[in-house]
């Protein structure tokens, strides 16, 4: 547009902290289930071509993260008996508000991020525990 100034705002990535307790069905090994869950909740393209839950292509500006979809995804993994989310929050902000509400809301320029990379913990952390 001639004579008009246009300002474009970039995304603001919001790192998440999620702690998930998992009970494993009899006949399955926790280590196998944990490895599968870490893959499923990754930010990578999985060997079978699926995208990990926190792959950047799965989230857009202002899109909330729903607790129910995380639980359903975990329970869909073969060998998972039950799932208990213990922490579901923005990183560094100790609050159970999103856990109680069942969703983490984001602003119009915010995008959820959870890389779970030990070298870059400031990009979100996903922790698995027994039970």
Regions found by a protein language model. Give the residues of each.
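Acidic, low-complexity glycine/serine/threonine-rich segments
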Residues: 1-131
């Amino acid at each position: 547009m001639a004579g008009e100034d246009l300002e474009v705002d970039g995304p603001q990535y919001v790192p998440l902290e999620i702690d998930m307790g998992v009970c494993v069905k009899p006949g399955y090994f926790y280590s196998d289930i944990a490895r599968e869950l870490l893959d499923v909740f990754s930010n990578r393209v999985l060997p079978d071509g699926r995208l990990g839950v926190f792959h950047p292509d799965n989230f857009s500006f202002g899109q909330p993260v729903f607790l129910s979809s995380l639980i359903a995804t975990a329970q869909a993994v073969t060998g998972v008996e039950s799932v208990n989310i213990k922490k579901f929050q923005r990183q560094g902000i100790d609050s159970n508000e999103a856990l109680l509400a069942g969703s983490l809301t984001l602003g119009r320029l915010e995008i959820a991020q959870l890389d779970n990379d030990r070298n870059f913990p400031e990009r979100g952390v996903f922790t698995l525990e027994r039970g």
